[in-house]
Structure formats: C-alpha cells, structure tokens
Amino acid sequence: MPLNWQKEAINDLRCHEKRKAAMESLADEIRELRSRTYGSSAPAADAVPVQGGTSTAEGRWIAAIDELERKKEAYRITKRQVEAVERGLAALDEQQREILDSFFINRVQGHVSALAEKYHVEQSRVYQMKDQAVRNFTLARYGVAEI
C-alpha cells in the first residue's frame, strides 16, 4: 500500500502545536530527571551494596538514567518533526501559511468564511487554495506531492 504523502503532511500540520507543547514538557521533565539523577541527592556511585546485590538506591538511579535517555530521545525525535514542519511552512508564502494554519494547525469554527472574506473570494475558492497549499507544503516537506 503506497504512502499518501498529503495525508502525512496534513497529519504533521494537525500535530504541530501538540508536538511543540510536548517539546516544552519533555524539556522540563529532562531538567527534573537530570537534577534528580545527577544532583546532590543522587546515590553515591561508589556505594557498596549490602549482601552482594545491587542497592535499592542504585537500582533507582539506573532506572532514572534509563528514563532520562528515553526522554532525551523522544525530545530529539519531536524536535526533528517540529523543525521539518517549520521548514515546510517557511517555503510557502504568507497566504498559504495562513490557510494551512486556519485549516489544520489552529482551526476555529468559521475558518472558511473568515478566509473567504479576508481574501475576497468564494468559499469554494478557499478550498481550492487550501488544496494547493497542502500540495506545496507536501512538496516542501517530503519532496513529493503525490505518488
């Protein structure tokens, strides 16, 4: 089954603000985990475990390091996705960015009427403009518009 690039592009646009919020949240969580893991309250790295096993504190420390690494990877992936969408949007003109924003990123009720009024066109023309903006964004984002 071939990939529908325009659907992928639309999904990227719809998720854009949520991904930006996730980046902020992940950055906060990473800072908190770093301070907990490597701060003054972290277990001593040279502590000798009792009765030959790993200490409970050491186990928590290892788990915190693992969680920190997973959060950092999630942040890197999310950041790449956000930057790719922003590069795709930057390749468009202001009108196309506004249309995509109104349809997919920050959609509000009455967006088609508002765009038709702003650009002095019929609502059917707004949908045509949206389709062209999606094609251009898809091309800028993925290098292909249709396959």
Predicted features by range, described:
Residues M1-A91, A114, L139-I147:
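N-terminal interaction/assembly modules
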Residues Q81, L92-Q96, M129:
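N-terminal positioning helix adjacent to the helix-turn-helix/winged-helix DNA-binding module
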Residues L92-G110:
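Short amphipathic alpha helix immediately N-terminal
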Residues R107-R125:
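Helix-turn-helix DNA-binding module
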Residues H120-A140:
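DNA-recognition helix of helix-turn-helix
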